[in-house]
C-alpha cells in the first residue's frame, strides 16, 4: 500500500456522505507497497481502508477483484470485503481516481517471518486455489511470461545504472524463460502477490489475506513459486530451506502438487523472481516526484534469481519428490 494521490478533507467528506459509515474522525495515508493510494479511515463505526486505484490497476478489472473477494469469503477464505454505498455500488470516484472502501481486518503483517507463518501461508494458499476453482469470472495475468519483455524493454536502457551487467543478465534469463516456460500445468485463480505485507497475523495465527489486485488466472504452481520467493529468504538474502519445506508440505496437505508441477517448480521460481525484479526495476527508475512511497530494491531479486538458477529439482527447496504428490 502507498500514497500517490492526495485526498483533501472536503473531497473525502463528500465521498463518504454516500456511505453509512458514521462520522469521519481521522484518516491517514499508508506508505507501504507500490501500486495504489491507500488510506486508513477511522469513523464512528470503526476502521476501514480507502483505496484509490492507480497506474497498474485498470478500472475494467475492478469488478473481477471485488467479486473474487466475495467469492472467496463465501468459501471460508478470510479476506477483506468491499463496502457498498447507499446506492449499492462498491466503486466510486475520488480525486479523479476509481475508489473503493474495504472493511478492516484485525492483525498485522509479520516483519520477521517465522516457520509457523510459512505453514499458515502454505495451507491458506492451497485453500485459496481450491476455493477459486468455481469462480466464473476470468482475468489474464498481464505479468506472466508474455508480459516480461515489455517490462524489460521499459528498463533496459538504464538497467546498468542500477548494477553493472544487469542488462545482459536480464536479457539472457528472459530468453531462457520464454523458451522453456511450462504450459500444461493446472491453472486457476491465483493471488499472484502473496507477500508478507499482504497477510495479516495475530501472533502466529493467520487472520486474513489482503490485496487481491494482481489476482488472475494462471498456473497454480506459479503462485507457489511466488511464495517461495516472498516467504523463504532471510534478511541477508540466504534461502531458508526449513521455511520452504514447511510451506510446501503445508500446501501439499491441502492441495498436493503433481509430479509435473514439482518438476517445473525451479523454473517457475526463476520466473517469479524475474517478474518481481523487472517490476521493481521499472518502479525504481520511475518513482513519481513527491510520492509518499518506499521503492523496493530490485537487486534483492537478482540475488534470489541467481539462487533459483542453481536449483535443479524440488529437493533444492527441501521437499522430496515422494512428498505431496497426487
From Swiss-Prot:
Catalytic reactions on record: L-homoserine + ATP = O-phospho-L-homoserine + ADP + H(+)
Alphabetic keyword roster: Amino-acid biosynthesis, ATP-binding, Kinase, Nucleotide-binding, Threonine biosynthesis, Transferase
Keyword Cell division: no
Pathway field: Amino-acid biosynthesis; L-threonine biosynthesis; L-threonine from L-aspartate: step 4/5
E.C. number: 2.7.1.39
Keyword Amino-acid biosynthesis: yes
GO MF term set: ATP binding; homoserine kinase activity
GO biological process: threonine biosynthetic process
NCBIfam families: PRK05231.1, thrB_alt
Family: Belongs to the pseudomonas-type ThrB family.
Protein name: Homoserine kinase
Organism annotation: Afipia carboxidovorans (strain ATCC 49405 / DSM 1227 / KCTC 32145 / OM5)
Gene it is expressed from: thrB
